């Protein structure tokens, strides 16, 4: 699982 990709998507959604 690519946590960096998931975190990036979450950060994009949060921002």
From Swiss-Prot:
Summarize tissue expression: Expressed by the venom gland.
Which GO terms label this protein's molecular function in UniProt?
Answer: DNA binding
Can you say where in the cell this protein is located? Secreted
**Chain's role:** Antimicrobial peptide which assumes an amphiphilic alpha-helix conformation upon contact with membranes. Insertion into membranes involves Trp-3. Penetrates into cells once membrane has been permeated. Active against Gram-negative bacteria E.coli (MIC=1.4 uM), P.aeruginosa (MIC=18.7 uM) and Gram-positive bacteria S.aureus (MIC=3.9 uM) and B.subtilis (MIC=0.7 uM). Has cytotoxic but no hemolytic activity. Binds DNA in vitro.
| Name assigned to this protein | Lasioglossin-3
Changes after translation = The C-terminal amidation is required for full activity.
Chief location of this protein within or outside the cell: secreted
Q: Per the record, GO CC terms? A: extracellular region
Which family does the UniProt entry place this protein in? Answer: Belongs to the lasioglossin-like family.
Residues with Lysine amide modification: 15
Keywords, alphabetical: Amidation, Antibiotic, Antimicrobial, DNA-binding, Secreted
Disulfide links within the chain: none
Q: Name the Gene Ontology biological process terms.
A: defense response to bacterium
């Amino acid at each position: 699982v690519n946590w960096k990709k998931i975190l990036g998507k979450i950060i994009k959604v949060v921002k």
